[in-house]
């Protein structure tokens, strides 16, 4: 089995940073790129930009203005799983399986806010429930 290079980046809006991501992909040349907080719907992902760089395969779960996860791959993706946690469909977790059986999961875990108390802070409660 040949080595597999995986990179991960909380991009905080893939459309605003498509040129930065493209530059990184050219320099680092990972086999798989996981992006979190893409902040756009599936149909607005700039996938053509990444296909030109050799990332012919993609799995994604987008959400307008919030969250969103994207996996770009040079290798063929056989299976895609989209997960929901805590009863919310908030585009935070996607998993793929490659031809050689390797599975890759991309998660965007909630920040949880400033107050680490599940009773007083609903965002922190969501983070703890997610984990």
Where do the protein language model's features map onto the residues?
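Structured beta-strand-rich core segments of catalytic domains in phosphoester-bond hydrolases
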Residues: 38-116
